[in-house]
């Protein structure tokens, strides 16, 4: 779910915190990517086109196709991705997970009704709602990434929290996900739409944590309380409080405790046994692996391993897989060259700089000739001692 209404609130009140760029703008950057979000995108993208890519046994492969070609595109653009996979969800998320299970049951019933009625639009809509990333999808994606030479991290809990920890430790530049709670976990940069298909022509949207705090006139602790008021995965929100009212309350009272002391109970209903304090602590101190102990390495791809893994039962085209492996190798070599070039920085050669250099060379030449002439003349006019 992420944080309800947060992106619009930032766009309305702190637009300076958002910048849109082409993918190539992030050339040379390391980016931590929410793997489950990516796999979900790849699965629903193919479902929306009406059919699942599958093995000879009917097992889906669209998540692998998406991961393979989208990762190649990132590397082609000079971006070094590291994929972060979810671990176990925190206990406080059980309520949200139960709601998702209920919505899934409703979607299954609605899909059956749409199928019986021959409603193509309804079939597509409810098919998308039934997509779920499984442990098997994640396992296969990790195997593929290893063969591609791209690192991944198994988060002990929430992937967004682990991504944020990598950003804060300086291991990567940004978190790439569609869930805004990466900012609530303290990621200083958040990239949305980075892993969208090229056909969608969506510019990458970059959110700056420092600029959004400045624009909203709050600190990081107050921002966490704002996100809880807006609605997060860990607890219910107060009914009747929308995004604009939430930021007004935070700007006035600075924390949830003081807001509750001053809230008009005739207008707003606070959830019974509201676990906002536990939710706050989950954002402040999430369960993550120590980022300093994580060693990120991008290595050469295993072309034969990729062919064996993707072709055969998974029915990928061997020629395309080999071409993809060559692109991976080329990207690896280009990144090595960039690192070498960074040791030998040269200033750009502008017309003014070139002309100035020519003038200096000519002046130096004239000075040398004059000096030579004087020395020669002095030698001829001097008597030997």
Curated annotation (Swiss-Prot):
Biased composition (Basic residues): 368-385
Localization in the cell: Nucleus, Nucleolus; Nucleus, Nucleoplasm; Mitochondrion
Ranges for region N-domain: 1-104
Any Pfam family: XPG_I
Stretch list, region I-domain: 122-253
PTM statement from Swiss-Prot or TrEMBL: Phosphorylated. Phosphorylation upon DNA damage induces relocalization to the nuclear plasma.
Positions in coiled-coil regions: none
Entry protein name: Flap endonuclease 1
Organism: Drosophila simulans
């Amino acid at each position: 779910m992420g944080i309800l209404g947060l992106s619009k609130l930032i766009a309305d009140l702190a637009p300076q915190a958002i910048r849109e760029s082409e993918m190539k703008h992030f050339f040379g950057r390391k980016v931590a990517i929410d793997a489950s979000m990516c796999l979900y995108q790849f699965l629903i993208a193919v479902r929306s086109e009406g059919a699942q890519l599958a093995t000879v046994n009917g097992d889906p492969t669209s998540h692998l196709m998406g991961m393979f070609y989208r990762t190649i595109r990132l590397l082609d653009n000079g971006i070094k991705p590291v994929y972060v996979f979810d671990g176990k969800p925190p206990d406080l998320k059980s309520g949200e997970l139960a709601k998702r299970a209920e919505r899934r049951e409703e979607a299954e019933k609605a899909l059956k009704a749409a199928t019986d009625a021959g409603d193509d639009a309804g079939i597509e809509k409810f098919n998308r709602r039934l997509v779920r990333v499984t442990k098997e999808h994640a396992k296969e994606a990790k195997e593929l990434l290893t063969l591609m030479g791209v690192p991944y991290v198994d988060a002990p809990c929430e992937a967004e929290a682990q991504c944020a920890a990598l950003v804060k430790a300086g291991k990567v530049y940004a978190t790439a996900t569609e869930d805004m709670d990466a900012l609530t976990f303290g990621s200083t940069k958040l990239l949305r739409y980075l892993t969208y298909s090229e056909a969608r022509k969506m510019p990458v949207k970059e959110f700056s944590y420092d600029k959004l705090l400045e624009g909203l006139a709050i600190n990081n602790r107050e921002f966490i309380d704002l996100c809880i008021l807006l609605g997060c995965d860990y607890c219910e929100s107060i009914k009747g409080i929308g995004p604009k009212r939430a930021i007004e309350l935070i700007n006035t009272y600075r924390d949830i405790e003081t807001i509750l002391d001053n809230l008009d109970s005739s207008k707003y209903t606070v959830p019974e046994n509201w676990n906002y304090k536990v939710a706050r602590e989950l954002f402040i101190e999430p369960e993550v692996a120590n980022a300093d102990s994580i060693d990120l390495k991008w290595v050469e791809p295993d072309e034969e391993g990729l062919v064996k893994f993707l072709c055969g039962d998974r029915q990928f085209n061997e020629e395309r897989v080999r071409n993809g492996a060559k692109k991976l190798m080329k990207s690896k070599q280009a990144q090595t060259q960039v690192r070498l070039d960074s040791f030998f920085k040269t200033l750009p050669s502008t017309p003014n700089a070139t002309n100035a250099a020519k003038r200096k060379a000519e002046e130096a030449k004239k000075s040398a000739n004059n000096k030579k002439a004087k020395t020669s003349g002095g030698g001829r006019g001097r008597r030997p001692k």
